[in-house]
């Protein structure tokens, strides 16, 4: 886990952020987990007197916008899969990792359980199933970090995959394809991750053998990253961002409401915050409203019915 970075210290009233910090700009890349956690952060910032904005941006454009100081923070830097897109921005100092907000996640290739039972259990098995798979691996939107790893495998003929092609689509498009394929009991290989409701919706298995591509056992962490200078410019806002933490069950609950129940992410965030005060009370240590007042009463009032 990333260590919390040092922040300027001061008394509660002196902790107020300047007016220029009021518009907290949080990139939302459109993944369901990103929509959920971004909505939680935005709800808290609104309760604290900020004016959060959540522009929808592609992953690579998120980091460009942070470099150009048009976005302040991003709560969905998946690692190790996301190490390549963010690398040049970390190298030039325009973006910095602030904290890990989720541990114990997974991100790698998966198959339906019946395909796993039939013998496709490891990355080394994919090539032998080529004709049955139509030489296709299903991924996410163009520019996605997981897509890039799959494309690198294909180009390098890693695991003898040079005949395969990656089918790029939105998250919902890919999952619709997975659903149709499972309904017809055909084989499919696709990008999968946890937390996500797909783990409840489908009987799926994560493939082994991809440690050098997606990390050991497909394990992942998710980080909060901020633009250069944000801790100094807006220390109170950055302090809250540094303390936000989620668990896999937390995110599964919120994502299920978004996907299955079609609830808007801001509504999901409010419901989750109201139902899980013990989760976020600790995030407020040293955090005030934007004008320096105590944070907990402000958030309680905001979340109260009619607030």
Region locations from a protein language model:
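Pocket-flanking alpha-helical
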Residues: 38, 57-93, 177, 197-203
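Short, well-ordered beta-strand elements
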Residues: 18-33, 50-55, 134-138, 241
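A conserved helix-loop-strand patch within extracytoplasmic ligand-binding domains
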Residues: 93-146
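A bilobed periplasmic-binding-protein/Venus flytrap-type ligand-binding module shared by bacterial periplasmic
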Residues: 106-117, 220-233, 257
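Short helix-initiation/N-cap motifs at beta->coil->alpha
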Residues: 31-32, 50-65, 165-177
């Amino acid at each position: 886990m990333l260590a919390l970075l040092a922040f300027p210290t001061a008394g509660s009233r002196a902790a107020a952020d300047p007016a220029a910090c009021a518009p907290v700009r949080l990139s939302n890349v459109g993944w369901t987990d990103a929509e959920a956690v971004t909505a939680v952060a935005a709800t808290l910032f609104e309760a604290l007197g900020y004016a959060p904005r959540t522009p929808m941006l592609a992953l690579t454009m998120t980091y460009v916008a942070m470099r150009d100081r048009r976005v302040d923070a991003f709560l969905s830097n998946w690692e190790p899969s996301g190490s390549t897109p963010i690398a040049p921005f970390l190298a030039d100092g325009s973006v910095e990792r602030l904290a890990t907000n989720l541990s114990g996640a997974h991100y790698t290739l998966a198959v339906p359980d019946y395909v796993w039972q039939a013998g496709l259990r490891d990355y080394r098995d994919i090539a032998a199933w080529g004709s049955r798979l139509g030489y296709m691996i299903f991924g996410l939107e163009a520019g996605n970090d997981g897509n890039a790893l799959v494309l690198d495998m294909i180009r390098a003929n890693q695991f003898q995959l040079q005949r395969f092609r990656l089918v790029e689509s939105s998250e919902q498009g890919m999952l619709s394809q997975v659903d149709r394929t499972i309904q017809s009991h055909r084989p499919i290989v696709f990008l999968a991750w946890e937390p996500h409701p797909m783990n409840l919706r489908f009987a799926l298995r994560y493939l082994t053998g991809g440690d050098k591509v997606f990390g050991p056992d497909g394990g992942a962490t998710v980080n909060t990253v901020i633009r250069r200078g944000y801790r100094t410019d807006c220390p109170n806002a950055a302090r809250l961002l540094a303390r936000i933490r989620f668990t896999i069950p937390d995110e599964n609950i919120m994502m299920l409401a978004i996907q299955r129940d079609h609830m808007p992410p801001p509504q999901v965030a409010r419901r989750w915050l109201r139902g899980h005060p013990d989760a976020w009370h600790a995030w407020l240590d040293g955090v005030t409203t934007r004008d320096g007042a105590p944070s907990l009463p402000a958030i309680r009032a905001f979340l109260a019915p009619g607030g």
